[in-house]
Amino acid sequence: MWLLLVCVVVGGFYTAWNIGANDVANAVGPSVGAGALTLKQAVLIAAVFEFLGAVLLGDRVIGTIESGLVAPSGHVLSSQDYVFGMTAALLATGVWLQIASFCGWPVSTTHAIVGAVLGFGIILKEDAVIYWNSCGRVFVSWLASPIIGGYFAFLIFSFIRKAILYKKDPVSAMVRIAPFLSAIIIFALGLVLILSGAVAPVISFSPALRIVCGLSLFAFFFTIWGIRFFKLAILPQEVLPGTLLDRLLSKSTDYGRKYLIVERIFAYLQMIIACFMSFAHGSNDVANAIAPVAGIYRTLYPQSYSSKVLLVFMSLGGLGLVCGLATWGWRVIDTIGKKITELTPSRGFSVGMSSAITIAAASSLGFPISTTHVVVGSVLGIGFARGLRAINLRIIKDIVLSWFITVPAGAALSIVFFLLLRALFC
């Protein structure tokens, strides 16, 4: 069985690598597309915060996928079938995510792993193995994710345009409103961490909420101080070439330069969002790769399973996320940040705030939503705020198609790998 365990660990790293290549774009894609961060800066920031989130808080979410959708109870599912099934789920998820990343499709990692887990449950022809009620609840929440995310993004960006961008003096309007925006985004991002349960092992709900409120208050006053000493004269070379801001600067008027100052402030706020979203993603999505590994190890070696072993697995998963982002992450980042619709920092900020609010609200209601669907829906909402012509409908068609086939693709690949493993090891 040690050879099978080696295959499982390698498969876990491979899956984490592909999660990093595909899913991390949710955190940094809008920032890169808006020009707030270069691709290298985004990769560096995401690498640090993804790894920290995976190692420090990743263990909280691992039990959900390990036992939340498929029952490994001895009287229903034998240990051998459970090991083969979870290994097949790992490999199926990794392969499908690699295909999607190569094509630049931002698909849901959770869709893929759930489809893969359901696949081996179906091949066993044991309805008792699968918790169908939980699966149905998950599917309903996933369908709602892009709609809710897009709606919030539309409202937030419409407010920003009316309250700041369309004013005669957008800089003065931004100075008044920015402290409130920074406080709200810190509060929303903090709620994402609290309500997802990621910080539960470290601190209880009430103290965590007080800390988040304190950080929001600090962000409010720090933003007031920061804007007061902000360098208002922004030089052209500070704007990334090829972005929408670069084209605006080439036609610069007095209003245009004020608009550029406002966008630069939004760029700093967007960097904060990228850091928080990367940390939250690392703490949550490392479970998609590591939960099957942990479950298999505990089944094969129950006496030696401990928190130290889990920490090693989480570190391996965090390293896989970073490697995947650094190698193939640019493909999906390009899709989310540039190909759906043109983004500026104010639009990217609206995407980030909408995503944080949607995820926090869903977590408080107990809905395990797809972050990918929320972010893509939020980007779409920004596009709709500017009109249908602002959206690349061909890219949207490809993305939606990839969403529909992710679950069945994961299930089909899982069945193939399950049968192969049975043939090899039985």
UniProtKB/Swiss-Prot annotation:
GO terms for molecular function: phosphate transmembrane transporter activity. Keywords: Cell membrane, Membrane, Phosphate transport, Transmembrane, Transmembrane helix, Transport. It is found in: Cell membrane. One of its GO terms (cellular component) is plasma membrane. One of its GO terms (biological process) is phosphate ion transmembrane transport. Its main location: membrane. It is a multi-pass membrane protein. Pfam families: PHO4. The keyword Cell membrane applies. Signal peptide: none annotated. The chain crosses the membrane at residues 1-21, 37-57, 83-103, 104-124, 140-160, 183-203, 207-227, 260-280, 309-329, 365-385, 399-419. Potential transporter for phosphate. This is Putative phosphate permease CT_962. It comes from Chlamydia trachomatis serovar D (strain ATCC VR-885 / DSM 19411 / UW-3/Cx). The lineage of its organism: Bacteria, Pseudomonadati, Chlamydiota, Chlamydiia, Chlamydiales.
